[in-house]
A protein has these predicted regions:
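A glycine/serine/threonine-rich, flexible loop-to-helix segment
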Residues: 54-62
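C-terminal substrate-binding subdomain of Rossmann-fold SDR/epimerase-dehydratase oxidoreductases
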Residues: 1, 46, 67-196
């Protein structure tokens, strides 16, 4: 929930990422309180869709890139860690509704449909119609075991919840990547950075 303030290792390898998000929420609320500036805080969870950056180390472009190049898909750990993927159109609608509201506390905007990274890689293999295997590599330190938003406030305050199914969103995203010139496929990451 939005009331959860985190349980992170501030000196771990992903500490800067986690702490930077918490700092931005703190500074945003400080401006809101002390300067009377209207602010909104949206907590965005894993987002995907056409035109996402090809080489930012996220799971989906890495998996699709590996599949398009005929490579095995890389999963860190045993693949049991979970993520929740929100299609970009749904995210934009959620952000817009928050901006148009008068609510100034944090709101989670993401898709609560949770999937393991192993299952997600299997979905990509099935979607692409390829015969790749999944290759497992050691899990990085402090990699989140679960990432699933509670969107109760988004539903109650904004009347928002995601509409695009993961299957539909994956198909749209895959078609976008597949139709890029083949030289662009080389820009897709060789594997994802597990900490994102």
């Amino acid at each position: 929930t939005e009331e959860y303030w985190g349980n992170v290792n501030p000196v771990g390898p992903r500490g800067v990422y986690d702490e930077a998000k918490r700092f931005m929420e703190s500074i945003t609320m400080a401006y809101n309180r002390f300067h009377g500036v209207q602010t909104r805080i949206v907590r965005i969870f894993n987002t995907y869709g056409p035109r996402m950056r090809l080489n930012d180390g996220r799971a989906l472009p890495a998996f699709i890139g590996q599949a398009l190049r005929g490579e095995d898909l890389t999963v860190f750990g045993d693949g049991s860690q979970t993520r929740s993927f929100c299609f970009v159109d749904d995210l934009v609608e959620g952000i817009y509704r928050l901006l148009m509201s008068d609510y100034d506390m944090p709101v989670n905007v993401g898709n609560p449909s949770e999937i393991t990274l192993k299952e997600f890689a299997e979905e990509v293999i099935k979607l692409t119609g390829t015969a790749q295997k999944i290759v497992y590599k050691p899990l990085p330190v402090d990699d989140p075991k679960q990432r699933q938003p509670d969107i109760t406030k988004a539903k109650q305050i904004l009347g928002w919840e995601p509409k695009v199914s993961r299957a539909e969103g994956l198909k749209i995203t895959y078609d976008y990547f597949k139709n890029l010139p083949k030289e662009e496929w080389s820009k897709l990451p060789k594997e994802f950075v597990s900490m994102k």
